[in-house]
Amino acid sequence: MLENSKISLSPGATIGILGGGQLGRMSALAAARLGFRCHIFTPENNSPASHVAFKTTIANYEDQDALRSFANESDVITYEFENIPIETALFLEQLKPVYPSPSILAISQHRGSEKKFATDHGIRVTPYELVTNYTELERAIIKLKTPSILKTCRFGYDGKGQEKLSDLNSAKKAWEKLATQDAILEQFVEFEKEISVIIARNN
């Protein structure tokens, strides 16, 4: 693993971004305003980020030759979203500094791990229960009450991979629809708005 803590970028440096979606596009536009170039790595043709990036590599995340070339042309590497294979991040970490680290990426890929990480660091989260089968879901509903939200632990984004439960009757259908994997049940929280924040820091 490369030592990441001492890296410093100056305008003109190239930031490698894994993923070519809307978040990659917004990151590339913001980086350009600061004088940085972005190299997008994505398996998708005609991705949103590719239209504004300095360079785009179109290849599978498992293509090590393409990943190596991508790393050689980047000064630092990051991701536009969390569903990047861990193996890809670990491979690239041997070649260039990768932020956030693959260990943090792994946490962000599982909602249960995210909740535990937050609570372990003193951050309050919505009351929740991990569930791996329908019996556990029924117990969780009795504990947390309804309305509640059933969410897949992995591959959920932009409202996908989740169902609002109004009672036990709706729980059965939701479980059959979503639970091909572990899930979490969250107590429903009334809210006025949702805020997304990207945080960066220097050394």
Report residues per predicted region.
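Active-site nucleotide/adenylate-binding loops and adjacent lid/helix of ATP-dependent enzymes
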Residues: 107-196, 200-203
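ATP-binding N-terminal substructure of ATP-dependent carboxylate-amine bond-forming enzymes
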Residues: 1-109, 113, 135
